[in-house]
UniProtKB/Swiss-Prot annotation:
InterPro entries: GlcNAc_MurG, Glyco_trans_28_C, GlycoTrans_28_N. One of its GO terms (cellular component) is plasma membrane. CDD domains: GT28_MurG (cd03785). Belongs to the glycosyltransferase 28 family. MurG subfamily. It catalyses: di-trans,octa-cis-undecaprenyl diphospho-N-acetyl-alpha-D-muramoyl-L-alanyl-D-glutamyl-meso-2,6-diaminopimeloyl-D-alanyl-D-alanine + UDP-N-acetyl-alpha-D-glucosamine = di-trans,octa-cis-undecaprenyl diphospho-[N-acetyl-alpha-D-glucosaminyl-(1->4)]-N-acetyl-alpha-D-muramoyl-L-alanyl-D-glutamyl-meso-2,6-diaminopimeloyl-D-alanyl-D-alanine + UDP + H(+). It comes from Rickettsia prowazekii (strain Madrid E). PANTHER family: GLYCOSYLTRANSFERASE (PTHR21015:SF22), UDP-N-ACETYLGLUCOSAMINE--N-ACETYLMURAMYL-(PENTAPEPTIDE) PYROPHOSPHORYL-UNDECAPRENOL N-ACETYLGLUCOSAMINE TRANSFERASE 1 (PTHR21015). The keyword Glycosyltransferase applies. Pathway: Cell wall biogenesis; peptidoglycan biosynthesis. The lineage of its organism: Bacteria, Pseudomonadati, Pseudomonadota, Alphaproteobacteria, Rickettsiales. This is UDP-N-acetylglucosamine--N-acetylmuramyl-(pentapeptide) pyrophosphoryl-undecaprenol N-acetylglucosamine transferase. HAMAP family: MurG. The gene is murG.
């Protein structure tokens, strides 16, 4: 059986799309090895049929610390990849792929890179000259060298299996959430301890906002959004609102106090183990604009207000969100220019003009691709034909 190596790490946003690709390749009869770093070790599930290898490559701002570690990891990568005897290596960008990709070049093994963002990252830009193909999630990639344009293949984003399973649900804001979601399923979705949780919740008049900001910028979300909701409810006191929000434990008490006084239902979590459950009942998402988030929302057609993380590498989150906004598939509010008043007005505008949400949902679905399938096809066409 032919062997393929995937290389991804650093964050779950790189790790999970690579896993989804690996699962598709295994279905096609390949043996899949996955090289990742210590940060992603926590995501590895023993039920996965992928063979994992952990390399210790950390990000250092000091080049004199980084180079010795890179050299050691490069030698380990050469030994590992040589022993695996793979046919191709797929890199997903980010610093953890540097040593294995250099090793692949040294061993003359074909490489394909996947760029999840609308802005070609530094690592992928460097390896683009050595890659057979560059698979992309977007049709318009910024920071792309002229020589690399002929290598571009639009495969779309790669989405986790549990999100792909939502494909049978169709977004409809007029029916509260996804049209095939029954009241029983809706009730079972939520923690029974959620404030205000009862059978009335499935009423179509309730508008649900799902808010998640990841570990970076959590403080902003915990302060900005409750203030915006307070303004929103003052402007529209009859609004039946439900909030599902990611928030750190030390922020939850203060936010609960605000929401309780506004008489709205709410649910909090530091981390959502299966985010598909929250997607199911949301009318609108407020989130950062990381590649995985955008890919998942695109796949199920769930509209969002994006607040890009300003410190993201190469400001790629802004470019991701702006591309969707330019295609009327979402809304981009920059953190440096946002205020609670502006956010409240945007939410109210969408609630008052729900056709905007329906249109954005359809525009998202128009961009949807089966990325795990298309990239697998590209690998086979490029390497094995």
């Amino acid at each position: 059986m032919k062997k393929i190596i995937l290389v991804a790490g650093g964050t779950g946003g790189h790790f999970f799309p690579a896993v989804a690709l690996g699962e598709e390749l295994i279905k096609r009869g390949y043996i899949v090895h996955f090289i990742t770093d210590l940060r992603c070790k926590k995501y590895i599930n023993k039920d996965m049929k992928i063979i994992f290898h952990i390399l210790n490559l950390k990000r250092f701002s000091n080049i004199f610390l980084f180079l010795p570690i890179l050299s050691i990891t490069f030698l380990k990568s050469i030994r590992l990849i040589y022993n695996i005897k793979c046919c191709v290596i797929i890199g997903f960008g980010g610093y953890p792929v540097i040593a294995p990709m250099f090793a692949a070049i040294f061993l003359r093994i074909p490489i394909i890179i996947h760029e999840q963002n609308s802005y070609l990252g530094k690592v992928n830009k460097f390896f683009a000259r050595f890659a057979k193909k560059i698979a992309t999630s977007y049709e318009d990639i910024k920071n792309l060298p002229e020589f690399a344009k002929s290598k571009i293949v639009l495969t779309g984003g790669i989405v986790r299996k549990n999100i792909r399973e939502l494909d049978s649900f169709m977004y409809s804001v007029s029916q509260h959430s996804l049209t095939k979601l029954t009241q029983t399923a809706l009730t079972n979705t939520f923690n029974p301890l959620v404030k205000g949780r009862n059978d009335e919740f499935a009423n179509s008049n309730i508008f649900t906002i799902f808010i998640f900001g990841g570990s970076q910028g959590a403080k902003l979300f915990s302060e900005l959004i409750p203030a915006s909701i307070k303004i929103l409810m003052k402007k529209q006191p009859s609004l039946e609102l439900n909030i599902i929000q990611q928030a750190a434990l030390d922020h939850q008490v203060k936010i609960k106090d605000i929401y309780s006084k506004l008489n709205i239902t709410y649910e909090f979590a530091e981390f959502f183990d299966n985010i598909a459950l929250q997607y199911k009942v949301a009318n609108l998402v407020i989130s950062r604009a990381g590649a995985s988030t955008i890919e998942e929302l695109t796949y199920i057609g769930l509209p969002a207000i994006f607040i890009p993380l300003p410190s993201a590498a190469d400001n790629h989150q802004y470019y991701n969100a702006k591309l969707l906004e330019d295609n009327k598939a979402g809304w981009c509010l920059e953190q440096n220019n946002i205020s609670s008043e502006k956010l409240a007005d945007k939410i109210l505008d969408l609630i008052s003009n729900r056709q905007l949400l329906e249109d954005a949902s359809q525009n998202l679905l128009n961009r949807k691709k089966e990325g795990h399938v298309l990239l697998s096809n590209l690998i086979e066409d490029t390497v094995f034909l």
